[in-house]
């Protein structure tokens, strides 16, 4: 069974010859975010023998719409318009993804990391400004979310149809319990979240939903429970929702993860024996069908690749 076949069968909750795995971290790109970054992705894949590549959007977190500099009040967000098809922000990410796809030569599935519109707006402004304006004029800020979603849709289309990605790894955030009630999130954020994800699903049936627990704050994860995606990844150790429990919670869909991604976790700090036992524990609890072994989120950039190889070797033996 090829890596691609293995992963796609896991997506479909079909039997596989062994459980697939996928891990990633933030790279240190060169100044132009060019070929060096592409090579880093391919080197990680080749060295560890993983079953998939998730291309990081390092260097493109901020949404660089020049209009943002003109915003001085919440009402100003009504003037935001999309950057459009020819934006370097979009073109350069598509080029990175295309080079990774070409470099892997069909050996595995490639997914590109795409953030939800609210997160891109938060990266492009600030936490404080976004939440302040959202309280002052939610309609204006929600208009901005919708505009950003149009640019993200353009990015998604080009990633899949031009770069050749198999799908996207869609990162949703901002549902922390301190930020919104579930009702508020569904009213303010859900529409733009789904505008992107549902569009991605018209282009590829193999998209991954990442329910991000990036800062260690629990989310109202129920707001994402019905988001349509082939596989789901969330922060097991932040949400206190095991891989087995999450598989039921997300309706029996393929689940991805299992390991704590933080430095205090077994993956980064444990012994080989401890990591191997954790692989056994996770799969005994969750099963081996519709499961992709990974982590809660990005792992530390200085992780010893040998630790990921231990996992792959253990899976080879099971």
Give residue spans per PLM region.
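Alpha/beta catalytic barrel-like cores
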Residues: 24-30, 51-83
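Active-site loop segments of alpha/beta catalytic cores
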Residues: 1-31, 36-40, 51, 55, ...
């Amino acid at each position: 069974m090829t890596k691609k076949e293995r992963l796609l069968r896991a997506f479909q909750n079909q039997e596989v010859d062994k459980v697939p795995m996928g891990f990633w971290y933030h790279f240190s790109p060169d100044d132009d975010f060019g070929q060096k970054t592409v090579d880093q992705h391919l080197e990680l894949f080749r060295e560890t023998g993983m079953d998939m590549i998730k291309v990081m959007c390092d260097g493109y977190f901020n949404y660089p719409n020049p209009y943002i500099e003109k915003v001085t009040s919440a009402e100003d967000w009504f003037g935001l318009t999309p950057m459009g098809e020819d934006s370097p922000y979009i073109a350069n990410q598509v080029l990175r993804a295309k080079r990774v796809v070409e470099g892997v030569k069909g050996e595995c599935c490639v997914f590109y990391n795409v953030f939800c519109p609210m997160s891109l707006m938060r990266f492009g402004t600030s936490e404080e400004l976004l939440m302040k304006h959202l309280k002052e004029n939610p309609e204006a800020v929600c208009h901005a979310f919708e505009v950003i979603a149009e640019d993200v849709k353009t990015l998604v289309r080009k990633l899949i149809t031009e770069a050749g990605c198999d799908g996207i790894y869609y990162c949703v955030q901002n549902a922390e319990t301190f930020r919104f009630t579930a009702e508020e999130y569904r009213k303010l954020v859900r529409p733009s979240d789904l505008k992107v994800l549902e569009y991605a699903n018209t282009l590829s049936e193999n998209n991954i939903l990442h329910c991000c627990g990036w800062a260690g704050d629990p989310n109202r994860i129920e707001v994402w429970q019905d988001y349509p995606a082939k596989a789901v990844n969330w922060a097991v150790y932040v949400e206190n929702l095991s891989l087995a429990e999450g598989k039921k919670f997300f309706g029996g869909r393929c689940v991805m993860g299992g390991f704590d991604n933080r430095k205090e976790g077994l993956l980064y700090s444990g012994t080989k024996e401890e990591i191997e036992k954790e692989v056994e524990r996770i799969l005994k609890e969750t099963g081996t069908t519709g499961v992709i072994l990974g982590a809660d989120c990005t792992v530390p950039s200085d992780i010893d690749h040998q630790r990921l190889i231990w996992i792959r070797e253990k899976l080879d033996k099971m």
